[in-house]
Curated annotation (Swiss-Prot):
Covalently attached lipid (N-palmitoyl cysteine), positions: 25
Annotated compartments: Cell membrane
Signal peptide span: 1-24
Protein name from the UniProt record: Putative lipoprotein MAH_0816
InterPro entries given in the database record: LpqH (IPR008691)
Source species: Mycobacterium avium subsp. hominissuis (strain TH135)
Family annotation (Pfam families): Myco_19_kDa
Topology of this chain in the membrane: Lipid-anchor
Length: 144
């Protein structure tokens, strides 16, 4: 009667190892919450206390602030050097706009350990003149 118990134990261990392997190989990863980020738009700083970092294969998504006011960044970590694919600024210091690689604007990304610094220009509009095109400079500093 010892053999059936050993078979059950072996089966449980095998299932646990298989589950661990599947989770480790999954393309989805857990989100990490960073403490703060500083987003500067046209020289005016905003300190944001909600920063969510998500890794999906070679892409890192950084969500700063909220849907109402904040920034969303997509970083391509496959590229050498690592590059910002897009930066979306939403209602910060009266500006809403974006940079997208291959489109208008520019972005320079510097990585030091887990600290990202992204600087550049984005195209969009200002809250006081939403019908007029506007360009703004930005600098985003955060850790993920």
């Amino acid at each position: 009667m010892r053999w059936p118990m050993q078979n059950r134990t072996t089966a449980v261990i095998a299932v646990a190892l298989a589950t661990t392997a599947l989770v480790a190989c999954s393309s989805r990863s857990a989100s990490a919450v960073s403490s703060t980020a500083t987003v500067t738009v046209d020289g005016k700083d905003s300190t944001m206390h909600i920063v969510k970092c998500t890794q999906l294969e070679w892409y890192r998504m950084i969500n700063i602030g909220s849907d109402f006011a904040g920034a969303k960044i997509v970083i391509d970590q496959r590229a050498h050097p690592v590059t910002a694919e897009s930066v979306r600024i939403q209602n910060l210091n009266g500006f809403t706009g974006m940079y997208s690689r291959g489109g208008d604007g520019n972005a320079d990304l510097r990585l030091s350990g887990d600290k990202f610094t992204i600087t550049g220009t984005a195209h969009g509009y200002k809250a006081d003149k939403p019908g007029d095109a506007a360009t703004a400079t930005f600098k985003i500093v955060t850790a993920c």
